[in-house]
A protein has these predicted regions:
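Positively charged n-region of N-terminal signal peptides that target proteins for export
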Residues: 1-5, 631-633
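Short, basic-rich loop-to-helix N-cap that marks the start of a DNA-contacting helix
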Residues: 3, 22, 607-609
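Sec-dependent N-terminal signal peptides
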Residues: 4-15, 612-616
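Extended interaction regions within the primary functional domain
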Residues: 13, 26-70, 561, 566-597, ...
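C-terminal segment of classical bacterial N-terminal signal peptides
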Residues: 16-24
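Peripheral, non-AAA+ core regions of ATP-driven protein-machinery
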Residues: 25-299, 311, 328, 336, ...
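Long, charged/polar, soluble alpha-helical segments
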Residues: 211, 218, 222-632
């Protein structure tokens, strides 16, 4: 009986392990794709080819990168960003997969993110089980928003790719005409000179003439997917003209306008009668003049219904008036700081108390705005203390004025949050989880971009990321989420604008795309049944900056509008999956063997290998187990 029981247990273990092994094998998808690179030799730079195998298996969100010859850290950063973008595009939860990237090359290549786009394509193909068309190769880094960023060494990469018999070569948008360095040998009166001169090259003509290859510009990963797989994700189109309306702020804007006019007149009279030096008085008058300019701008913007922009301008006006007010009346700065701290703490307590009453997405967005402004008020209070301790009275009164007026705006957004509180209550656990995911994403993008442009260029992103972490620790999860969004945006615009150079055409196209993306995000929110009021505020502000030809801030505000509109989308509709459109079949040529890639397999071969290996291990285990069972008897 004992032998029969033991044998039954052995068989149960055997079939269970075999089933697990088979399930794992069937769930394994691997894709091998080729990416052009640049290698440095004694005679200069030449093209090289990377063979990248990507596997996606059920797991816990780990990402493993195996490279040979060794490459730089940006390859790891590119892999992580590829997973992030792939998850967003496919709608799959990438934390439920482990990803393996095996990168091989016949020669050492120069570090760089130019394979990021290819890695993203391969990652999506692995997740979806799609085949790759090997008649196509591509160069281009991956941006956090899924667009393809510019790279160098395009001619060298094209030369290397041509040797593989490809038919199409994909390049980032705006890089079909590039500047290369041409080395010229000149002789003048017996003296030979080697001169390097810049030379413009039309990549389309060069590829057609020398190799018969078609060069195609890409805007984003979705475009690349079409050429590599014959499939792409359906993209939302703007349905008619998207109307942005901030009328819900009209009452607050009118109140603020009247308040600022009266405040300005009052402090102006007080300044005129104040006893101080002529230069000191003129210096204060300039603050009031600047405030008046903001008031005048706000009046004009209110005429066209731009109420959020008007409120922003009136906030600035009130700060400048407040500086003069504090300068004239704050005789005891230490006491003023104590009073201001009590005011901010009181508003903080009210916010904590009212937070429990918040219901619905719109109310939650306004709560985010209130919490973020509260953090701002505390930060400027700390700055004011430092200035007072260092006897810097002028900067101290500016920081005091800012913290005081910012505290007032916390009340404004909190009241709006309560006014529009309706619907279901949002789970704190969901908010906490969402905030942490956003922070992790912001960390990833920051590391990626800083590896490209240096940490000093993304200091604003680092500051916002630190703010996100501190707000998360304080339990203000909506504020933490928005600071994480801010960090992500700051990193993204840094890399995108820095790679655009001074080309107004490229920058204009990026702003247009950002504007359209924001419109689509607003449209999606409306289709899901709620009005993304805060996103509309940022969109309006972006239009205002665009009218002023402030490209960087317009770009920034449109990106804010998009991200804010989608910030809580998964809470209201977590199961939304993208639609796949097949437009043309993908015709694939056989892929040559990968250099030094023994053990790298395709999807089916990998599954068979894992199944055979797993079965063998199970058999070995069974033999030991059976033997020990009967020897024990």
């Amino acid at each position: 009986m004992d032998k029969k029981l033991s044998m039954a247990l052995v068989l149960l273990v055997f079939f269970s392990m075999l089933n697990i092994t088979a399930d794992f094998a069937l769930a394994t998808d691997s894709v091998t794709i080729r990416a052009p690179a640049v290698s440095k030799t004694s005679s200069g730079y030449i093209g090289a080819v990377l063979y990248i195998t990507v596997s996606a298996v059920p797991g816990d969100g780990h990402i493993y990168v195996d490279t040979w010859p060794l490459t730089e850290l940006d390859t790891q950063a590119s892999a992580r960003l590829a997973v992030e973008v792939a998850g967003r595009m496919t709608g799959k939860d990438v934390t439920k997969y482990d990803f393996y990237y095996v990168v091989r090359s016949e020669s050492p290549v120069i570090g760089g993110p130019s394979a990021g786009g290819v890695m993203t394509v391969a990652t999506i193909a692995a997740l979806e089980g799609w085949k790759i068309n090997n008649d196509v190769m591509m160069t281009g880094m991956i941006n956090p928003d899924g667009t393809i960023g510019p790279v160098g060494g395009i001619i060298e990469k094209l030369d290397a790719s041509a040797k593989l018999g490809i038919k199409k070569f994909l390049v980032p948008w705006g890089q079909t005409v590039i500047t290369t360095q041409e080395t010229i040998r000149e002789e003048n009166r017996g003296i030979i000179q080697i001169i390097t001169k810049p030379k413009k090259v039309n990549v389309v003509d060069y590829a057609k003439k020398n190799y018969g290859i078609e060069v195609i510009e890409l805007e984003d990963v979705n475009d690349a997917l079409f050429y590599f797989t014959g499939k792409k994700f359906s993209e939302k189109e703007i349905k008619g003209e998207i109307q942005v309306n901030t009328d819900f702020l009209s009452e607050e804007a009118n109140k603020s306008l009247q308040k600022n006019i009266e405040y300005h007149d009052s402090i102006e009279k007080e300044l005129k009668s104040a006893k101080m030096g002529i230069y000191e008085k003129k210096y204060m008058e300039r603050y009031l003049d600047t405030a008046q300019d903001f008031i005048d701008k706000a009046k004009e913007d209110m005429k066209t219904g731009e109420y959020y922009t008007s409120l922003s301008e009136l906030f600035n006006a009130e700060i400048y008036i407040g500086v003069v007010d504090e300068y004239l009346n704050a005789d005891d700065l230490d006491k003023r700081l104590k009073d201001l701290e009590e005011k901010i703490n009181s508003v903080d307590s009210e916010l904590k108390e009212k937070r429990e009453e918040i219901k619905g997405i719109v109310s939650l967005e306004f709560l985010s705005a209130a919490e973020k402004r509260l953090k701002d008020a505390y930060d400027y209070l700390d700055q004011a203390r430092n200035y007072v301790n260092n006897y810097d009275s002028l900067n101290a009164v500016y920081a005091i004025a800012y913290a005081d007026k910012r505290c007032d705006t916390v009340k404004l957004w909190l009241n709006l949050s309560l006014k529009y509180s309706q619907g279901e209550k949002i789970s704190i656990d969901d908010l906490k989880e969402d905030a942490w995911k956003r922070i992790e994403e912001a960390k990833l993008v920051y590391v990626y971009v800083s590896s490209m442009v240096g940490e000093s260029s993304v200091s604003d992103a680092a500051r916002s990321l630190n703010d996100a972490l501190s707000e998360y620790e304080a339990g203000r999860y909506t504020s933490a989420l928005f600071y994480a969004i801010e960090s992500n945006i700051e990193s993204s615009i840094t890399i995108e604008l820095s790679m655009s150079g001074d080309d107004p055409g490229v920058i204009g196209e990026k702003i247009q795309r950002a504007r359209d993306d924001a419109k689509i995000a607003i449209q999606l929110s409306r289709e899901e049944g709620y009005e993304p009021m805060l996103a509309e505020c940022y969109y309006e502000y972006g239009e205002n900056f665009e009218e002023k030809e402030d490209a960087a801030n317009a770009f920034r505000m449109y990106k804010y509008a998009k991200e804010v509109a989608l910030a809580y989308k998964h809470i209201s509709n977590p199961e939304t999956m993208p639609t796949v459109v097949t437009e043309t079949p993908s015709v694939s040529t056989p892929l040559p063997s990968t250099p030094s890639s023994q053990g790298t397999t395709t999807s089916k071969e990998g599954s068979k290998f894992i199944l055979i290996l797993g079965s063998g291990l199970v058999g070995l285990f069974m033999g030991i187990l059976i033997g020990s069972t009967f020897r024990g008897k």
